[in-house]
Amino acid sequence: MMTENADKKREQIHLLCMDEMVPKDHLLRIIDKAIDWTFIYDLVKDKYSHDTGRPSMDPVTLIKIPLIQYLYGIKSMRQTVKEIEVNVAYRWFLGLDMTDKVPHFSTFGKNYTRRFKDTDLFEQIFAHILEAVSYTHLRAHETL
């Protein structure tokens, strides 16, 4: 007997936990467990205004998105953002639920230029990440 996929399944509503949808051995889960991301806030606090301007993008998210791009060999920030829109593991890693809007790809260039130009913040942040990851079973950090 032939079975047909019902189009109705596309419109079903399910109550899901994103944490359960990301495998326990997923690379991003392992990295997230290995790193205490709060160190980034201390490094960048003098680059943000606390009183004026529009709400900023979370600096941890600003670092995690290019990390996803690098780890998964995505060629451009524009494509990275498109991938994040549909990838549950990426959203989980970034702390976004399925309805949260993914930042526009141009947000990154603007933030990097305005906040991090002429600094070594990225080097400090990624050195810290590599050090933290080196203590996990991802010891081949030389390849990162």
For each of these PLM feature ranges, what is it?
Residues K9-Q12, D42-K45, F105-F108:
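Short acidic (Asp/Glu) and glycine-rich catalytic loops that position anionic groups and cofactors
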Residues Y48-S56, Y70-H128, A132-S134:
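Basic, low-complexity intrinsically disordered segments
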Residues R29-L67:
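Basic, short loop/linker segments at the boundary and entry of helix-turn-helix/winged-helix-like folds
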Residues M21, I30, A34, L43, ...:
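Residues that form generic nucleotide/phosphate-binding pockets
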Residues L15, K24-L28, W37, Y41, ...:
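Alpha-helix initiation and N-capping motif
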Residues M1-D36:
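Charged, often Cys/His-bearing segments associated with DNA-binding zinc-finger transcription factors
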Residues H26, I63-I65, T80, H104-F108, ...:
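Short, conserved catalytic/metal-binding motifs centered on acidic residues
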